[in-house]
Amino acid sequence: MERNTPKKAVHFGAGNIGRGFVACFLHESGYEVIFAEVNDATVSKLNTHKSYKVIEVGAEGTTEKTITNYRAINSRSNEAALVEEIATADVVTCSVGPNILKFLAPVIAKGLAARSTDLTPAAVIACENAIGATDTLAEFIKSPENTNPALLEDYDKRATFANSAIDRIVPAQDPDAGLDVKLEKFYEWVVEKTPFKEWAVPDIKGIKWVDNLQPFIERKLYTVNTGHATAAYYGYTRRKSTVYDALQDKDIRDEVKNALKETADLITEKHGIDEEEQKQYVDKIVRRISNPHLEDAVERVGRAPLRKLSRKERFIGPAAELAENGKDCSALLDAAEMAFRFQNVEGDDESFELAKIMEEKKPEEVVQEVCGLQPSEKLYPQVVDIVKRVQADSNEE
């Protein structure tokens, strides 16, 4: 079944990923983009300036794209207008951070409840660095506090929820850049097509549609995000300013490669990915995060250490699986230790919260609370030892 025309997309989060990655592809695919954003200044800028530039940087030079045909709505103060837009949108996307998804659910639920079941179902795609982010969002939307259970009987006529994996490095921006966004040329946006069943998938350039997303999500999270964060946390402890600077240090580069060798062992065995193919993927990732044009500060890449040390994230996720299988995960644990040392970093609330937890709690409590590991898991005692070591060093300082 064909989709509606003219095409309209609602995107939550007008940050760098929202403007520079998701909205760029939606615009190039002929959608009008309505940004849903809570920052008044950003909403005002988007509604005042009728275009902005997306600047792609790489070793082979720079390209610029101009984005137009968009509007912005303050999702906090103008909910009614946003509900109307969602009720008639073809696509609803977001890039707000996994922890914010629960706050989007009420307004999306209202928009979908107001939607005619005669329309093609809205394609809802969360573009977050988290496994199963769209499933998480869907659970919040369909919960009784947000949606009348009676509506769920034919909810597939209102919305199709599809998980995605996104991969693009967007560094901190020049403070004078305004709405313009600088990012790397490389990108990957993979979305599962199976939820669409008899409906046509949305016509969006840049998306690779697949039947099974899990290998793509885990390969990306456990290679790009693991590698990027490992470089940042080692770089921070060794007083490097950018990820590029960190990777010029042979010791740090070796630590990154060792961590990615361990995740490669997991990925190739678990998902049947060819070892040589994964090796080439790893080499490409190391080159990407070594891009001097990105000027990516270690503090930016390392921010939110509590999330990055959590159970399904880039260090503990793969390390726990490797440990259960009796495989080596020592480099991942060393990287996790560096993440535990990312404390009291200016501009990052989670790093202050981590410092407080490390100061006030017993090692076993820290591991269960921060990493979500249970004493029955093989990785548990090894992470307890890391926390003890970091706490001991903090007490000596």
UniProtKB/Swiss-Prot annotation:
Instruction: Quickly give the catalysed reaction.
Output: D-mannitol 1-phosphate + NAD(+) = beta-D-fructose 6-phosphate + NADH + H(+)
Summarize where NAD(+) binds, as residue positions: 9-20
Gene Ontology MF terms: mannitol-1-phosphate 5-dehydrogenase activity
Q: Which UniProt keywords apply?
A: NAD, Oxidoreductase
Q: Where is the active site?
A: 220
Task: Tell me one GO biological process term.
Answer: mannitol catabolic process
Alphabetized SUPFAM superfamilies for the sequence? 6-phosphogluconate dehydrogenase C-terminal domain-like, NAD(P)-binding Rossmann-fold domains
Does the keyword Oxidoreductase feature in the UniProt annotation? yes
Oxidoreductase: is it a keyword of this entry? yes
EC number of this enzyme: 1.1.1.17
A GO CC annotation given for this chain: cytosol
Return the broad EC class: oxidoreductase
Instruction: Quote the subunit structure annotation.
Output: Monomer.
Functional summary from the UniProt entry: Catalyzes the NAD(H)-dependent interconversion of D-fructose 6-phosphate and D-mannitol 1-phosphate in the mannitol metabolic pathway.
Q: Which NCBIfam families match?
A: PRK02318.2-5
What protein family is recorded?
Belongs to the mannitol dehydrogenase family.
What name does this protein carry? Mannitol-1-phosphate 5-dehydrogenase
Its taxonomic placement starts with: Eukaryota, Fungi, Dikarya, Ascomycota, Pezizomycotina
